[in-house]
């Protein structure tokens, strides 16, 4: 694992996740596509007393920033703030994209081929694990099993069925064959935020998954639309890493919109972006309190 800070008492991501598992708390993961949001996330994490933070770029976000640029930016912010920050390639969907992130210096990769038949999903995850291990055995690899519906946006309603959930016996087989470090599973969670229905996790189902396959670090994706209590209950049941994205985007968007409404003639970017980043920072601080 690449160390971004010269004097920080460094630990591997796997060690932070293991400590979270043993301590029954979770490490936060927050996506970014701009420097100000990255700084807001890291600043909030450091001020909250969280042991570390994960930041992620989706394929779209990394396409906007640039994969090597994202690595350089995270490295600079982590060093400047003297705080452990781990950069994750979030839901990369092909081996080639995962390889590009690994070669550029990402600390972690999610190979998301959950849309494929299980055998193909296993083969893809195994290929990424084997390549990552050959480059640096400390790079953390996450697989995904189950149908995680939605996108990182606000929608009215998304139909959720137990048939979409990750099946405990399949998760156990996936972990056994691939050797992934982390697992993203589906038990009522969705990507994005819905306005006309209540999102609710099926905690008993998740507990069955943990019993069937206790080894990996379990990851909750799509936490933006969930209640704080649902997130807390998932952590009690074994979640050690929680992803937020849509809520950050909404907070950023809404504050920029507010700034333009209040000051329609303002054209200096930092004068309307800085308040938006501050709103993101407040939101991240709240989420990190929930994860403790």
Task: Say what each PLM segment does.
Residues 8-28:
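N-terminal amphipathic alpha-helix/helix-capping segment at the start of soluble metabolic enzymes
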Residues 15-17, 35-56, 60, 69-80, ...:
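Alpha/beta enzyme core
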Residues 25-33, 58-62, 271:
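A short N-terminal beta->alpha junction/helix N-cap motif
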Residues 26-31, 53-56, 85-90, 109-111, ...:
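Hydrophobic faces of well-ordered beta-strands that scaffold small-molecule active sites
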Residues 66:
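Conserved, carboxylate-rich catalytic/transport cores that coordinate ions
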Residues 226-292:
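C-terminal alpha-helical cap/extension of soluble enzyme domains
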């Amino acid at each position: 694992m690449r160390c971004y800070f010269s004097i920080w008492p460094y630990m591997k991501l796997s060690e932070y996740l293991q400590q979270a598992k043993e301590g029954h708390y979770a490490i936060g993961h927050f996506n970014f596509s701009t420097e100000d949001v990255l700084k807001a996330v890291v600043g909030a994490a450091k001020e909250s007393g969280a042991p570390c933070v994960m930041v992620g770029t989706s394929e779209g976000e990394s396409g906007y920033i640039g994969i090597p640029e994202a690595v350089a930016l995270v490295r600079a912010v982590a060093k400047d703030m003297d705080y452990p920050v781990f950069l994750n390639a979030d839901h990369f969907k092909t081996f080639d994209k995962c390889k590009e992130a690994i070669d550029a210096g990402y600390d972690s990769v999610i190979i998301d081929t959950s849309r494929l038949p299980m055998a193909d999903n296993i083969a893809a995850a195994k290929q990424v694990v084997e390549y990552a291990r050959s480059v640096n055995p400390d790079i953390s690899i996450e697989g995904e099993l189950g149908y995680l519906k939605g996108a990182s946006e606000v929608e009215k309603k998304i139909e959720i069925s137990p048939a979409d959930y990750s099946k405990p016996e399949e998760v156990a087989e996936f972990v056994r064959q691939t050797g992934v470090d982390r697992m993203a599973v589906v038990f009522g969670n969705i990507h994005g935020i819905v306005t006309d229905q209540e999102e609710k996790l099926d905690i008993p189902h998740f507990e069955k998954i943990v019993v069937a396959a206790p080894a990996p670090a379990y990851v909750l994706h799509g936490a933006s639309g969930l209640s704080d209590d649902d997130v807390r209950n998932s952590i009690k049941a074994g979640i050690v890493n929680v992803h937020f994205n849509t809520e950050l985007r909404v907070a950023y968007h809404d504050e920029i919109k507010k700034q333009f409404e209040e000051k329609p003639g303002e054209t200096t970017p930092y004068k309307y972006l800085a308040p938006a980043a501050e709103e993101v920072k407040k939101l991240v601080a709240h989420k990190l309190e929930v994860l403790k």
